[in-house]
């Protein structure tokens, strides 16, 4: 997401509407299972009980829990990983080659192996964890809001692909075969350079994904179909890997209708999308949460209780191993 800084503050997730929608139980498994629901809650890193709260309020446990880490330290933090795993979810780490302290990690230097020692240490930590984990390295590369973004610091699609392949190669040599690589550009609706130029190839990727947000800038609202439709078909052309929406959110205005249309009508038509992770936080002054109002939360709950959103961690991991549909 543009301009996001990872936070460890306790999230306000669901507190305003919990009293009203309160003690609903977890949805029972349904017969048709195709799409996994994932959660990003900034509190989950330090307070894994927020994942339990998500399940109680939404009515379905998340199959993916999303975390964000920069290159200041090894991202495979046992408390985070177990916090997700013990609750039936696979952890997904967005691994950002930048630093809170301003240290630079240029793509060209990554590709040449300058940071291999750090990458190897991270790969060993992943291998020691041993269980499957989704890893998003250097996401939204087709935009210009991250240091590895297109056109910044001499970055090119060629350099990006070389850096991606270098990192994956190091992990494979270490034996971190439990890592599933998730390549995630921003949608071509707003992403700047067409993302297909940055794709490193199916040999180097386990999942392909998209990030996209209905910010409401300029007073204009974009539907799910407008945000993701064209980019979905481009992904389908360049890769045979399973797809996910790795970040999604929408502004407050019209949120209830937007969520209902997206999850009930528009997303199910994009049949290769097997997971959706809602970015349940704010950014750039926009409240992107699905629970920003009781109406929006009600729409989200009603949509994801449908059996099509019942994919589990087990089905996800089988999917990303053998590339079959659900």
What is the role of each PLM region?
Residues 51-60, 74-93, 121-130, 198-203, ...:
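Acidic (Asp/Glu)-rich catalytic clusters
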Residues 77-96, 203-254:
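Glycoside hydrolase catalytic-domain groove-lining segments
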Residues 77-183, 279, 291-293, 300-304, ...:
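Substrate-binding cleft of extracellular glycoside hydrolase catalytic domains
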Residues 1-29:
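Secretory targeting and sorting signals
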Residues 30-73, 317-321:
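Boundary/entry segment of secreted carbohydrate-active catalytic domains
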Residues 164, 168-194, 240-253, 278-281:
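Aromatic-lined carbohydrate-recognition surfaces of secreted/lumenal glycan-active proteins
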Residues 33-42, 242-326:
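Substrate-binding cleft of secreted/luminal carbohydrate-active enzymes
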Residues 60-70, 195-222, 244, 279-281:
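Aromatic- and acid-rich polysaccharide-binding/catalytic face
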């Amino acid at each position: 997401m543009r301009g996001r800084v990872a936070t460890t503050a306790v999230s306000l997730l669901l507190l305003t509407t919990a009293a009203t929608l309160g003690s609903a139980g977890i949805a029972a498994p349904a017969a048709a299972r195709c799409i996994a629901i994932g959660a990003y809650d900034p509190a989950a890193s330090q307070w894994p009980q927020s994942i339990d709260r998500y399940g109680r309020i939404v009515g379905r446990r998340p199959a993916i829990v999303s975390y964000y880490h920069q290159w200041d330290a090894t991202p495979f933090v046992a408390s985070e990983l177990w916090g997700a795993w013990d609750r039936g979810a696979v952890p997904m780490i967005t691994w950002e080659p930048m630093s809170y302290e301003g240290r630079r990690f240029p793509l060209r230097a990554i590709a040449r192996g300058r940071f291999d020692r750090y990458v190897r240490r991270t790969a060993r930590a992943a291998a020691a964890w041993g269980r499957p984990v989704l890893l998003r390295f250097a996401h939204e590369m087709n935009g210009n809001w991250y240091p590895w973004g297109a056109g910044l610091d001499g970055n090119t699609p060629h350099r990006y692909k070389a850096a991606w392949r270098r990192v994956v190669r190091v992990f494979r040599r270490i034996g971190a075969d439990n890592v599933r690589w998730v390549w995630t550009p921003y949608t071509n609706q707003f992403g700047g350079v067409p993302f297909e130029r940055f794709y490193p190839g199916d040999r180097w990727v386990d999942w392909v994904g998209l990030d996209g947000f209905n910010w409401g800038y300029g007073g204009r609202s974009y539907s799910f179909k407008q945000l993701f439709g064209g980019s979905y078909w481009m992904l389908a052309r360049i890769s045979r890997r399973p797809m996910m929406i790795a970040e999604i959110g929408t502004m407050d205005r019209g949120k209830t209708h937007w969520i209902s249309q997206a999850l009930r009508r528009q997303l199910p038509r994009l049949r290769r999308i097997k997971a959706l992770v809602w970015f349940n936080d704010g950014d750039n002054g926009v409240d992107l949460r699905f629970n920003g109002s009781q109406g929006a939360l009600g729409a989200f709950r009603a949509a994801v209780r449908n059996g099509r959103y019942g994919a589990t961690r087990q089905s996800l991991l089988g999917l990303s191993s053998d590339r079959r549909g659900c």
